[in-house]
Every structure is written in structure tokens, then in C-alpha cells.
Amino acid sequence: MIYDYEVTTGKGETLSLSEFKGKVVLIVNTATGCGFTPQYEPLEKLYKDYHEKGLEILDIPCNQFGAQAPGTDEEIHEFCTLHYNTTFPQMKKSDVNGENELPLYTYLKSQKGFEGFEEHEFKSLLEKMFSEADPDWASKPDIKWNFTKFVVDREGNVVARFEPTADICKIEECIKALL
């Protein structure tokens, strides 16, 4: 369960995920300079529409994919609130893959591995880029790019993983079914 893990907020405070017991949680690694950055808009809409019903969103900025999350935690927060009016909690910029990855992400990936990209304008580009770098990329559970999302149910179980190419409507349906 995710309740065994902690993250650090953008303000440097430790946040135990046990605080989210009884809530549906959407965990997403983000970046401010990515082609998927406009996903902040529908994420904020999800938060506004379902927060009162028990949805929490954890925004975890990550600079591991194309260095697309430059700046300090404060600068990232300012960007998101200024351009997308985000109100959901934003965590400290962190790694989601590799030796310095958050333990939370080690757990998330162990529960829901990569199952492929959905049809999207960036699908071919992403697949080409990854296969050139690593022929075995598709068989690894690693986070592939910014805006990969994990949905956690009210009991703390990871129930779904959505790649950045997933339609937000699919994510919303998954969340609604759990609320």
C-alpha cells in the first residue's frame, strides 16, 4: 500500500501518504517544459470536480526526461499556478527512475508496469526514441516520460497506470468508478 511511503512537499515538509487513507489518489510525474504540460489543465479540472468526493492529486515534478522540469521547486510551483491555476498539492522535484528514485516510485512500478502507449500524436515519436536508446525498453516497468499517472484506490492499492498518451476521459472513468 502507498500508506507506507513518504514524499517531500515543494516547501520541504515530509508528507506521509497515510494522510490519504480513504481517498482515491492520482500520482503524476510532471514537467513544465514538455509537450504534455498542457495536461495540467484537465488535471486541475479533475481535482476541482472530484476533490470534494475524495480525490487527491499528487504532482511530483521530475527533470529526468529531456530536462523538461528546470528551475527550483518554487519556480515550478509559480509556473503551474500562473499558467494553469493548479491548486492540487505539488511535491519536491524528484527522480522516478534510477538509483535516486523515490521509494514510492519503486513501489508504484512494481505494482503496475509499462503496458504500452495508447494512440496519440506522440506515440510513434516516443516509441522510436526509446527503441533507439534501448531495444528492451518496452519490457521494463520504468516510467517512460513525463505525465505518467498512477491511480490508487481508497485502500491504498495501485489499481491503474496511465501513460502520458492516455486519454484523460479514461483516467476520469477510472477515478469515478473508485469514488
Where do the model's predicted regions map?
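Conserved helix-turn-beta segment immediately C-terminal to the redox Cys motif
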Residues: 23-24, 32-61, 80-84
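Thiol/selenol-based redox catalytic cores and closely related redox-interacting motifs
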Residues: 79-81, 85-166
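Non-catalytic, surface beta->alpha helical segment in thiol-disulfide oxidoreductase systems
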Residues: 159-179
